[in-house]
């Protein structure tokens, strides 16, 4: 008997569960049915609404009550466009929502086929974050980033468009969850000790030096940390120069461009 494959649809569900989602609201349709079929076999509570706007507004209510993104799922075409009022309201009023919409197959996107609208562009002005996923393996990361954006700064709505042949694909990547929400200001002694223990207990720790790391005080602190811990370091291009020549054995390149395999 062939081994059961891990599907993109199940990855979406596992990502939602990893991030504390208990309820999903929406209306099924052909371009998103793989996800609804997976929901039928899972313990997330699915509530089918009579209109996509209702799904978005109920999700907004969940977001307002819990502080976590309420989730609405719809099919392509009018299923997505009917979300607009609900998502715009959530963004305007500061309530976190994650909406997921179906889309035609990737090879149909430029053929002007039935319901092949540009979902992400349609909802960009109504949301804090709007994107379409082209790679099934990146689904969990994109959804997690969308949920982070929905609850960062002023809360609001995020939207993810998923083509039919993406949601139906097998995947190898694991579903991920949100990292701990960052705190502003000086960390407490307990928080510093927790970071120290996390570094000690990690198998493959890495230090990512980004945009704000290149000022003098931050650069000096990072260099002292690397000297003491021997952490490997990767940089964004805005963090270039943080690692000095005497620490070059700890430098593993830059991320984000040119497919630097070591850094990435």
Across the structure, where does each feature detected by a protein language model lie?
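N-terminal alpha/beta PP-like core and its mobile active-site loop of ThDP/TPP-dependent enzymes
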Residues: 2-264
């Amino acid at each position: 008997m062939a081994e059961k494959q891990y599907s993109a649809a199940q990855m979406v569900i596992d990502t939602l569960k990893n991030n504390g989602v208990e309820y999903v609201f929406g209306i099924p349709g052909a371009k998103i049915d793989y996800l609804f079929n997976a929901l039928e076999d899972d313990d997330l509570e699915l509530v089918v609404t009579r209109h996509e706007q209702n799904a978005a507004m109920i999700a907004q209510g969940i977001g307002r009550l819990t502080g976590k993104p309420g989730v609405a799922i719809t099919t392509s075409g009018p299923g997505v466009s009917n979300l607009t009022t609900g998502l715009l309201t959530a963004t305007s009023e500061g309530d976190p929502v994650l909406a997921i919409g179906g889309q035609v197959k990737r090879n149909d996107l430029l053929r002007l086929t039935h319901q092949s609208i540009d979902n992400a562009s349609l909802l960009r002005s109504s949301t804090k974050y709007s994107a379409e996923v082209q790679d099934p393996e990146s689904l969990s990361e994109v959804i997690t980033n969308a949920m982070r954006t929905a609850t960062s700064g002023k809360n609001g709505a995020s939207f993810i468009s998923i083509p039919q042949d993406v949601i139906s694909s097998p995947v190898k990547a694991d579903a991920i969850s949100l990292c701990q929400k960052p705190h502003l200001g000086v960390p407490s002694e307990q928080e510093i000790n927790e970071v120290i223990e996390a570094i000690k207990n990690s198998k493959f720790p890495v230090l990512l030096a980004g945009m704000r790391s290149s000022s003098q005080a931050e650069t000096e602190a990072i260099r002292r940390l690397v000297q003491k811990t021997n952490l490997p370091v990767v940089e964004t291009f805005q963090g270039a120069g943080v690692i000095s020549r005497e620490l070059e054995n700890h430098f593993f390149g830059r991320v984000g461009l040119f497919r630097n395999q070591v850094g990435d």
